[in-house]
Design a protein with these regions (language model features):
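ABC ATPase NBD coupling module
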Residues: 21-25, 79-95, 121, 241-246
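Conserved ABC transporter NBD signature motif
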Residues: 70-78
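Conserved ABC ATPase "signature" region
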Residues: 78, 129-146, 255-256
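Conserved ABC ATPase signature
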Residues: 151-155, 159
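A short, proline-enriched helix->beta-strand linker immediately N-terminal to the Walker B motif
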Residues: 170-174
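A short, surface-exposed alpha-helical micro-motif characterized by mixed small hydrophobic
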Residues: 218-220
């Protein structure tokens, strides 16, 4: 299968605040020499506890932060070498769905305005074409077009998450990074959104990196799974291999913690 994303020896360090100016500078490694590949049209899971580095990796892919060292290749090209035009295209091709959809929506603007603003920034379509595109993507995420006249605070958490997904997909990206996309939702709503994501991924043929601390969600949704712990990649395996012998010790601990919560 053709790869869309390749990460080579990625490290991200942050300075640790000093208690005294006389202390030597110390660094915390949020990512430590991480290497992996993501294949085109797959759903790739990044799982780990809080502080594992999974969200840091997502931000690096989106160019929201700059790595300390290492490379990220998109379609075979180092994203740090992009010129202005290539970066503009990359911003369309790679989209993000945040954990808190409310924070990614303008509370003072109607949903329709927010969706069409995204198209406007990307210089896609005329005003009438943008309206039709907004109506279509809302139907695809199982929302009525009339929601375009509503404000974010008039919607439920599940509805706002659907709008967040619509906002990412309206520009027809090649890669979507979803960071804890269902963790704030009720279990029943989680299931609805996960099923919707599966359907949308098949319809739009986008690659998805799904970031979560929940191994149950990751195992249900993803084709392959990468496990991170303290910034270090523990292993990468196919989802159906989760319960096989030979998993890394940290993966086993994650799995045991999930079983304890279910008891």
């Amino acid at each position: 299968m053709a790869e869309i994303l390749r990460i080579e020896n990625l490290t991200k360090e942050y300075k640790i605040k000093k208690d005294s100016i006389f202390e030597p500078t110390k660094y915390f490694k949020a990512l430590d020499d991480v290497s992996l590949t993501v294949n085109r049209n797959e759903i790739f899971g990044l799982v780990g506890e809080s502080g594992s580095g999974k969200s840091t990796l997502g931000k690096a892919i989106l160019k929201l932060i700059k790595p300390t060292s290492g490379k990220i290749y998109f379609d075979g090209k180092d994203i740090e070498t992009f010129d202005k035009r290539e970066l503009f295209d990359y911003r369309r091709k790679v989209q993000m769905v945040f954990q808190d959809p409310y924070s990614s929506l303008n509370p003072q603007k109607k949903i329709g305005w927010s969706l069409m603003e995204i198209l406007g920034i990307q210089k896609i379509g005329t005003k009438q074409e943008r309206i039709k595109m907004a109506e279509k993507i809302l139907e695809d995420v199982e929302m009525r077009p009339s929601v375009m006249e509503q404000y974010p605070n008039e919607l439920s958490g599940g509805q706002r998450q659907r709008i967040s997904i619509a906002s990412a997909l309206i520009v027809e990206p090649e890669l979507v990074v979803i960071d804890e996309g269902v963790s704030a939702l009720d279990v029943s709503v989680q299931a609805q959104v996960l099923n919707l994501l599966n359907e949308l991924q098949e319809k739009y043929n986008f690659t998805c990196i799904f970031i979560s601390h929940d191994l149950n969600v990751i195992e249900y949704l993803c084709d392959r799974i990468a496990v991170l712990h303290n910034g270090v990649l523990q292993e990468v395996f196919n989802a159906e291999e989760l319960f096989e012998e030979g998993r890394a010790e940290y993966t086993k601990k994650l799995f045991e913690s999930v079983k304890m919560k279910l008891r």
